[in-house]
């Protein structure tokens, strides 16, 4: 099938730039959500692999690429991100309360997907999360686990007012560094670097506003008690959608403790740990990811 690009304007005024593959009349519908600091193009190969039997849509979430970029960080709170996804699902399925077959999400896209699955489970038949912490687990680990607190220190840099300028400096050197902990990885080809550069050149503050809007960040000092006082109601963390979690175990930002006790919030969750893969498992081991997604789609 041929990749298509389009803009989807939602009823509440937000426009999402989208990429899609697969026939419009395919028997299955799949939506794929990006993570920081990427963009929807990272799903192109995945969509091509699934397209023979599925209509796949990968939106750039608000704040990313050519999608609407509200200036106020408050516009990136979960209720607004979930509203975007609910409206996109309605536009994709042809009506409200019609579910998609599979929602696939990585990193910040996973944050949106966890919230949607908790608040509107009727819209998703199956969920696949890729290296994205459940909000309840993230709160617990940021509050109680020194290893995760240390691993998440980078968040404090992302919320700085000058973060966009700092990350854009020297041809986005700091952003490219997030993709390549020990030197440029083999998957980060010159063509892919050019795609990242083109997206980042359209603005970074929208993507950074996800971090600015979130209360889930490590304490800034022993006196910082914000996380101790934060309570997430069960209604926003309990997920009753069949869920598969794919997890690259060499993720230096998201430590393994984030998987502990996940079944308490997500009954029946299936967890596939992948040794030797990092946060960027979709790029590092695409064949393995494709197979897990095909399995999830076949189970619907």
PLM feature spans:
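Flexible "cap/lid" subdomain of the alpha/beta-hydrolase fold that forms the substrate-access gate
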Residues: 2, 16, 22, 57, ...
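Active-site helix-initiating loop/hinge in glycosyltransferases
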Residues: 35, 77, 284-285
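Charged catalytic carboxylate motif
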Residues: 42, 84, 206, 288, ...
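Short conserved AdoMet
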Residues: 51, 266-267
């Amino acid at each position: 099938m041929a990749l298509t690009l389009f803009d989807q304007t939602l009823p509440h005024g937000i426009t999402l730039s989208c990429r899609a593959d697969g026939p419009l009349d395919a028997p299955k519908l799949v939506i794929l959500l990006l993570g920081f600091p990427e963009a929807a193009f990272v799903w192109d190969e995945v969509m091509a692999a699934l397209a023979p039997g599925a209509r796949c849509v990968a939106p750039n979430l608000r704040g990313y690429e050519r999608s609407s970029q509200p200036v106020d960080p408050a516009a990136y709170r979960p209720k607004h991100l979930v509203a975007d996804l609910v409206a996109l699902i309605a536009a994709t399925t042809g009506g409200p309360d019609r579910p998609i077959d599979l929602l696939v999400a990585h990193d910040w896209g996973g944050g949106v997907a966890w919230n949607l699955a908790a608040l509107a489970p009727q819209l998703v038949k199956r969920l696949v999360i890729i290296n994205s912490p459940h909000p309840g687990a993230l709160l617990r680990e940021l509050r109680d686990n020194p290893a995760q607190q240390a691993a998440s220190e980078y968040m404090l840099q992302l919320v700085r007012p000058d973060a966009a300028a700092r990350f854009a400096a020297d041809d986005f050197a700091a952003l490219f560094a997030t993709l390549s902990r020990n030197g440029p990885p083999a998957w980060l080809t010159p063509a892919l670097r050019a795609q990242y550069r083109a997206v980042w050149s359209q603005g970074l503050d929208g993507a950074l506003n996800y971090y600015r809007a979130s209360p889930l960040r490590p304490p800034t000092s022993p006196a910082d008690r914000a996380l101790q006082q934060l309570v997430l109601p069960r209604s926003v963390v309990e997920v009753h959608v069949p869920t598969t979690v794919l997890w690259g175990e060499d993720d230096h930002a998201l430590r393994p403790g984030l998987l502990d006790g996940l079944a308490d919030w997500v009954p029946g969750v299936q967890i596939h740990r992948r040794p030797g893969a990092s946060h960027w498992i979709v790029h590092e081991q695409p064949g393995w990811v494709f197979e897990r997604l095909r399995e999830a789609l076949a189970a619907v």
